[in-house]
């Protein structure tokens, strides 16, 4: 398995060092659900600004305040404890008067707004996240500036970030031990973290190997191409290569790599052969995903940060602003800019 810090850089390894998250305020995440509350229904959507609190802790506190079971409070995604984050929580409170959530008090948290909603907010049910990231102690401003311009034009690898694999790669190591032992794992959280880490590592490896090719973004026979901004994809035929390549160049289509698991991987012919070869040695992890009936899926190989802008406060400090679709990692953008120091593996996105 390719170590995370050895994954291929799209723009070459950064020349500059820098500090990520010197303070929680240096990493601001604003959740974008992509829809507004209905204004009616048995659920209440609550938008919360938090600093120094993890999502589950706040959700449990909200449940206690509302005198409901913790499972009746849901959210679309985990957000980092060591950052300033805005996100929505959803509480099921049917047949009751609208609770006065302005009275909900928790250190580090502030209720910004709340409204009735018809449906439960489910994990992953968000459009994306808006990020404001401040990088400090940059050693080579010109290198970072050049890279920012390149990222605006060519994007970054859509890697799963280091935080997916746990501190010191603990989640991936757990998956490997599980895969090799075959023993049952009954802890639901461990199962989820370990399976996710296994699939993410296999995806990252495919992308890293493909990026080593000079024509990595050249469509090949059997590639599964994703419609930009959507989850649907189709398999390209030899007759469609030229037209599809033009659409990839225009960012209308995205080349994908497999998230391995049970069932059809989605790609065919030359593309499938490449993916199989890229992770051929990782038989234990592949077998684990099949055994645990994790369904195979696809994910775009490249990521194009939207609304990307930056402002140099001085020669060693830059503020970045960009929007990413759900499931993408801000740290994968930062990785292409600087060799980071600071809190990296603990950032939940």
From Swiss-Prot:
Pfam families: TruD. It catalyses: uridine(13) in tRNA = pseudouridine(13) in tRNA. It comes from the Bacteria. GO terms for biological process: tRNA pseudouridine synthesis. Substrate binds at residues 27, 129, 329. SUPFAM superfamilies: Pseudouridine synthase (SSF55120). Residues 155-303 form the TRUD domain. The keyword Isomerase applies. InterPro entries: PsdUridine_synth_cat_dom_sf (IPR020103), PsdUridine_synth_TruD (IPR001656), PsdUridine_synth_TruD_CS (IPR020119), PsdUridine_synth_TruD_insert (IPR011760), TruD_catalytic (IPR042214), TruD_insert_sf (IPR043165), TruD_pseudoU_synthase (IPR050170). Its EC number is 5.4.99.27. Keywords: Isomerase, tRNA processing. GO terms for cellular component: cytosol. GO terms for molecular function: RNA binding; tRNA pseudouridine(13) synthase activity. The keyword Plastid does not apply. The active site is at 80 (nucleophile). NCBIfam families: PRK00984.1-4, tRNA_TruD_broad. Responsible for synthesis of pseudouridine from uracil-13 in transfer RNAs. Belongs to the pseudouridine synthase TruD family. This is tRNA pseudouridine synthase D. It comes from Klebsiella pneumoniae subsp. pneumoniae (strain ATCC 700721 / MGH 78578). The lineage of its organism: Bacteria, Pseudomonadati, Pseudomonadota, Gammaproteobacteria, Enterobacterales. The gene is truD.
């Amino acid at each position: 398995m390719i170590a995370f810090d050895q994954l291929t850089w799209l723009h070459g390894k950064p020349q500059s060092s820098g500090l990520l998250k010197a303070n929680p305020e240096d990493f601001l995440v604003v959740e974008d659900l992509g829809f507004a509350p209905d204004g009616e229904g048995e659920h209440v959507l609550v938008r919360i600004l938090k600093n120094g609190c993890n999502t589950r802790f706040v959700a449990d506190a909200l449940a206690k305040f509302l005198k409901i079971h913790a499972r009746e409070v849901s959210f679309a995604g985990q957000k980092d404890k060591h950052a300033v984050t805005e996100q929505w929580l959803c509480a099921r409170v049917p047949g009751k008067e609208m609770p006065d959530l302005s009275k909900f008090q928790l250190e580090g948290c502030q209720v910004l707004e709340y409204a009735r909603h018809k449906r439960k907010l489910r994990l992953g049910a968000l459009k994306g996240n808006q990020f404001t990231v401040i990088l400090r102690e940059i050693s080579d401003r010109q290198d970072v500036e050049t890279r920012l311009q390149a990222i605006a034009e060519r994007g970054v690898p859509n890697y799963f970030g280091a935080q997916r694999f746990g501190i010191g790669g603990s989640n991936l190591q757990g998956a490997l031990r599980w895969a090799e032992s075959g023993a049952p794992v009954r802890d639901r959280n461990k199962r989820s973290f370990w399976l996710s880490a296994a699939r993410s590592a296999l995806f990252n490896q495919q992308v890293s190997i493909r990026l080593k090719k000079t024509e990595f973004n050249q469509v090949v026979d059997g590639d599964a191409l994703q419609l930009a901004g959507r989850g649907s994809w189709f398999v390209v035929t030899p007759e469609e290569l030229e037209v599809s390549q033009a659409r990839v160049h225009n960012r209308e289509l995205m080349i994908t790599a497999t998230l391995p698991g049970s069932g059809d991987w989605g790609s065919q012919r030359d593309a499938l052969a490449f993916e199989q070869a890229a992770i051929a040695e990782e038989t234990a992890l592949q077998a684990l995903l099949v055994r645990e009936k994790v369904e195979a899926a696809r994910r775009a190989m490249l990521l194009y940060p939207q609304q990307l802008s930056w402002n140099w406060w001085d020669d060693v400090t830059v503020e970045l602003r960009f929007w990413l679709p759900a499931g993408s990692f801000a740290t994968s953008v930062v990785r292409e800019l600087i060799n980071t120091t600071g809190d990296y593996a603990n950032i939940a996105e």
